Amino acid sequence: MAENLANHLLDEMIEALSSLPGIGRKSAFRISFHLLRLEQGLFNQFIHQLTDTKNKIKFCKRCGSYAETEICEICVSEKRDSHTFCVVEQPEDIFFIENTREFQGKYHVLNGVISPLEGIGPRDLRIKELLERIEPEQVKEVLIATNPTLEGDATADYLANQLKPISVNVTRIAYGITVGGSIELADQYTLGRAIRSRLQL
């Protein structure tokens, strides 16, 4: 009975871990046994950190990125170029761009891309919120950093058309990111070069 219970619990743990992006069943298997071998104090600390992070991290009310407060550190920073916005698909894209140290402006998260096949249209994204920020924050350039996919391209084109009537320079992240690739998988050099080589839309 105990043996079956242990196997059942392990299977559930492995299944839960393998549902995470980038973790296959073999990796989930190794992680599960590593966690079981952890000293109880370290294990409790690990679980506490996960729970604490999940409970305290929220979305910035201004840009939509992850934040510990209502407005994130980048949005309130006076050291950032508040006249330049970088528009990304997801909050995690900001972390990869920040690692390049090439972009010194502020961000806006769309929370996805236009995808008719999945029933996602412009109204399902944070496009309205972006347009509402342009004039009050005196934005002069919007760098569109959507992924070079069909959906990312369609979203970039839509944004460019929406921003045309406004007196703002619209650019897009360029060379270095392969078509069909993603910002998350690009190395710092490639992503940095893409930011430096952004194109006028």
Swiss-Prot record:
Disulfide bond residue pairs: none
Zinc fingers (C4-type) by residue: 60-75
Keyword DNA repair: yes
NCBIfam families in alphabetical order: recR (TIGR00615)
Function: May play a role in DNA repair. It seems to be involved in an RecBC-independent recombinational process of DNA repair. It may act with RecF and RecO.
Chain's gene name: recR
Keywords: DNA damage, DNA recombination, DNA repair, Metal-binding, Zinc, Zinc-finger
GO molecular function: DNA binding; zinc ion binding
Toprim domain location: 83-178
PROSITE patterns: RECR (PS01300), TOPRIM (PS50880)
Superkingdom of origin organism: Bacteria
Name of the protein described by the UniProt record: Recombination protein RecR
CDD domains for the chain: TOPRIM_recR
